[in-house]
Amino acid sequence: MARQSAEPPTDDGQSAKEIVVITGGNTGIGFEVARQLLCNYGNRFYVIIGSRTLGKGHTAVAALKQQGYEAVQAVQLDVTKEASIAAAAKIIGEQFGRIDVLHVNAGVLLEPTDINAKPVPFSETIMETMRTNVAGAAATVEGFTPLLSIGSNPRVVFMTSTAASAQLMHQYSSMTTAPALSASKAAENIIMIYYYHKYPNWKVNACYPGYRDTAMMRRYNASSLSKAYRQPDPVEEGAYNAVRLSLLGKDGETGTFTEYKGVGEDGQRQYSALPW
């Protein structure tokens, strides 16, 4: 394929392309969102992959550039460390002057042995999960709020899960296998709603990617937590809704919790609301 050109910022630090930041964008759904934005909307977006380990971020960028996508770079970004978030925001602000889309994608799914490689109290697993999935999500939005506020159409996409749904969890016992994740994603949805109300001129939404073939899900399926009854679905489809929410205009939806549902009879991709 023809190689895309990376657009440098203008003299005032602004870029004509929309600037997208994806936390945890070096792998899984986050990486696929980056790939699809560059593949299908490369003339519109410049993508910044946030990675806890900068080396992994550079590896992800190299993989994308190998496919011909140039409008991408990496930044070190650990959502559990406010200093890391602040440093990333400073780098991006000095280079581009703003961001337009923030994907709050970084997250963890811990087993009761993941923290110390030995059994730990359930409460400790909850606290460690909340540190990334909830406090980290909020810290990320807070850290990038000044740059988002400069843009004319800020969009924030929280990558969450149906594991957050009390209604579904009450109805299906199979959804109780990862309660720390469920509690964290329910709290993350509340954080999303908080920002939806706080910034009425932004587009703030929650997105469920589905049960997808990512490294996180493969680890989960091999763990003691899993009651998986089928193989995960292709990762490509898991990015569709997040990409859609990235494209929203000033009159687009906000305050929603949605997922991709497949292709309808009209040949168009279908999306639906999920129960809280």
UniProtKB/Swiss-Prot annotation:
Q: Mind telling me which InterPro entries this protein's record contains? A: NAD(P)-bd_dom_sf, SDR_fam
Q: Which UniProt keywords apply?
A: Monooxygenase, NADP, Oxidoreductase
Tell me the active site: S161, K185
Query: Listed GO molecular functions?
Result: monooxygenase activity
Q: Which residues bind NADP(+)?
A: I29, S51, D78, N105, K185, T214
The metabolic or biological pathway listed in the UniProt record of this protein is: Mycotoxin biosynthesis
Its EC number is: 1.-.-.-
Listed Pfam families: adh_short (PF00106)
Q: Which family does it belong to?
A: Belongs to the short-chain dehydrogenases/reductases (SDR) family.
Question: What does it do?
Answer: Short-chain dehydrogenase/reductase; part of the core atranone cluster (CAC) which products are predicted to catalyze most or all steps of mycotoxin atranone synthesis, starting from geranylgeranyl pyrophosphate (GGPP). The initial cyclization of GGPP to dolabellane is probably performed by the terpene cyclase ATR13. The Baeyer-Villiger oxidation near the end of the atranone synthesis, which converts atranones D and E to atranones F and G is predicted to be catalyzed by the monooxygenase ATR8.
- Tell me what this protein is called: Short-chain dehydrogenase/reductase ATR10
Name the gene: ATR10
